[in-house]
Amino acid sequence: ADVKGTARVNVTGGTLKGVVGGGLSYLYTIAALTDAAVTTDVKNVAVNITGGTINAMDHNSGLDGFGIPASVVGGGVAYSKSTVTTNKVEATVGNVDMTIAGKGAKLSGDIYAGGFAHGAKTAASVNSTRLTIADATLGAADSQVNVFAGGYAAQGATSTVKTSEVTIANSKIFGNVYGGGNKADAQSNVTVESSVITLDGADVTGIVSTESFEPSVNAALMRLAEADTGAGDAEANKPQRTINLINSKMGTLQISAKQDTETSLYLVGSNTVGEITGGKASEIVFDGTGTPAGEAILTLTKEGASFD
């Protein structure tokens, strides 16, 4: 079914096995069915989570059961068991606006601003996403919750997000924050064309990365302040990553290691960064004020970035 208006999901309490903002497109058969088309199209999605316990998804239709390694998926879910390449399974969403706010919300799985896709010729796409996490504590020392600006793809599927904005304000994340998506295998494809990550007074215990487990962001701008204090226009045909740290805290800052990527790092105020990784193949430009907390001295060169 398609939704021409806005699909709204409000969670204030209770216990759930996952939240999906978009539609569900399923093709269960593994028989020789050809030219099948299963599609859903949702124009707008609005998700507001202020309470409740949301566990990782465990779906069972009665015909087939499968798990989704996430508590929240902003886009839709496209799932297929068929291996016939003439079949088509798609879940499309126009715009996603998702908020997770307050100490009452408890999540045990990851958060994807984009959609979930599983199976050959299966695709989940989102035009734009906006995820806001405010005044929250997500995860625990023994239970990570990772945040992805993009979606998830497995078994030869494709998940795409055109533009994504992730804002984490006055919150603690026991896990990692990625400017890209996540794919389970080399046959799958995950893409985020452009992403903005803003960390304002956030404490991320793990990695803050311009990319994901595998590079999937074509153009990323990371901000750690209310205002953009980044560099100017990127050189022609050269992706640019801008990272602004203003009174922020994280375990590891992971910058792009793509050879054609220029990364600019700005430090203002008191920032605690355990280590910086990546960038060995990048041209790294340092232009800012402030130093990391502690006794470490920040070193940035074209060969890499590290603490001495």
Regions picked out by a protein language model, each given a short descriptive name:
Residues 1-110, 115-146, 150-176, 182-308:
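Surface-exposed loop/turn motifs in large extracellular/passenger domains
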